[in-house]
């Protein structure tokens, strides 16, 4: 259990240290992201300094719907649209930006998306990667100027080089992603989320926490805004929902701090390939 006092202290200190913040969700049934999104978006200029844009990618079947805005999340009409309309998905990646590499503009907002093997892949990153923009690319090119997007293109390049077609065993991709994440981590800070519509890959370089909600469900209270949800009224007993965030979003829930240097993968709301 995370102590509320510790969360308040971490929130103040992280405003200085954290360059961006990430939010991911992976579930076994389509689940509404609005509660967690409502907490994260407050950190986009109101309770946090991440005013340089925001974005969300969520899957609907094999398709991936994205919204981006270079405006602060707490002021964005598009963010308000997402926050007030039902958004249910098995996999979601959100990002609020504190620009450190690349100017503030639409093309530099995360998550980034590309196609591989006929699937939409989404990626968001927190940190700085020294020298990564010098790494050669073959199949993919950045649209913007961030080191994050270059790293994403490089990851997919490496996966495509090793596996031109989908490997028979999904764990082959997991093993490769772990190696690629370690190489990126050697260049600086690489907290990242990567999704192929089925698996959500999360790498912790400095700071990520995660929480799995399942029956019996209870109430949850956001840290950054006055909002409470009783999940017992919003779910069924079979629902399994895992939320991953740079910093915990709620009080009095058993958030787990992810081990630094580790890639944790989720499918259907559960950790796989541990």
What do the PLM-derived regions correspond to, one by one?
Residues 219-262:
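A conserved acidic, glycine/proline-rich C-terminal tail/linker
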Residues 144-147, 205-229:
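Gly/Ser/Thr-rich active-site loops/lids in small-molecule metabolic enzymes
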């Amino acid at each position: 259990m995370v102590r509320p006092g510790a969360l308040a202290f971490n929130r103040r200190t992280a405003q200085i240290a954290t360059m961006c913040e990430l939010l991911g969700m992976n579930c076994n049934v389509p689940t509404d992201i609005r509660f967690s999104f409502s907490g994260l978006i407050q950190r986009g200029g109101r309770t946090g300094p991440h005013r340089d844009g925001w974005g969300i990618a969520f899957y609907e079947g094999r398709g991936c719907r994205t919204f981006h805005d270079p405006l602060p999340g707490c002021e964005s009409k598009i963010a308000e649209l997402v926050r007030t309309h039902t958004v249910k998905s098995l996999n979601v990646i959100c990002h609020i930006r504190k620009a450190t590499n690349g100017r503030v503009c639409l093309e530099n907002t995360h998550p980034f998306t590309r196609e591989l093997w006929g699937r939409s892949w989404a990626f968001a990153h927190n940190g700085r990667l020294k020298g990564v923009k010098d790494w050669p690319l073959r199949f993919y090119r950045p649209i913007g100027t961030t080191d994050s997007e270059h790293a994403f293109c490089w990851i997919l390049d490496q996966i495509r080089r090793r596996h031109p077609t989908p490997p028979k065993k999904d764990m082959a991709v997991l093993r490769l992603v772990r190696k690629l994440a370690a190489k990126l981590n050697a260049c600086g800070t690489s907290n990242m989320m990567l999704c192929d519509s089925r698996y959500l890959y999360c790498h912790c370089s400095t700071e990520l926490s995660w929480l799995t909600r399942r029956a019996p469900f209870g109430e949850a209270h956001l840290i950054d805004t006055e909002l409470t949800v009783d999940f017992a009224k919003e779910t069924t007993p079979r629902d399994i929902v895992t939320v991953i965030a740079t910093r915990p979003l709620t009080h009095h829930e058993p958030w787990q701090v992810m081990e630094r240097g580790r890639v944790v993968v989720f499918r259907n709301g559960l950790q796989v390939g541990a």
